[in-house]
Amino acid sequence: MLSNLLLTGLPKSGKSTLLENFISLVGDRKRGLLTREVLRNDERIGFDVVTSEPETARLARVDFASSLRVGKYGVDTSLFETVLRPLFNVKEGELLYVDEIGQMQLHSVEFGRLVQRYLDAPQLCIGTVSTVYEHSVISALRERKDTQIIEVKVENRERVFSIVKEVGERYLKGETVLEPITI
């Protein structure tokens, strides 16, 4: 039985925006996190994580002095992990979401545990996953029988959003079985 829906695609394909737009339509019955870019003078200087609690933490910055690096960004897992703790307290009926299961986030072992917790939960979990980075957590989730992965492309973004919205609405009405989706 499918209970997880993961959106994948190249950077800038729209997968995070799609998930964020969907999550904004869901009421209070949700738990998870979104990764947002931080801009200064129209230039990306880092990434923050915003949770459903709501809490915000800096995840990465160009000026972080950290041994954990992703490109030009230093990653601070201690700040990140502080806001993750409450997200483990999953309540029945909540829709779970994670943006993004990617290289910066997976520097945190706690984040890997949270992803596993969400994917193993009986609730619907909708997330985004990197296509440009491999990690044991990403490899394992690609093999899960309870997970459907949909590639988001410019030409199918609107269709994928409609599908995600429909699946989420059905789940929140009490339908717990996710049917295989064809794009």
Residue ranges and their predicted role:
Residues 7:
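Hydrophobic anchor at the beta1->P-loop junction of P-loop NTPases
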Residues 15:
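Conserved lysine of the Walker
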Residues 20-24, 85, 165, 169:
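Generic solvent-exposed, charged/amphipathic alpha-helical segments
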Residues 52-94:
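Helix-adjacent hinge/juxtasegments
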Residues 98-99:
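Hydrophobic residues in beta-strands of the RecA-like P-loop NTPase core, especially within AAA+ ATPase
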Residues 10:
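P-loop (Walker A) phosphate-binding loop of NTP-binding proteins
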Residues 20-70:
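N-terminal phosphate/diphosphate-binding loop that engages ATP/GTP or pyrophosphate donors
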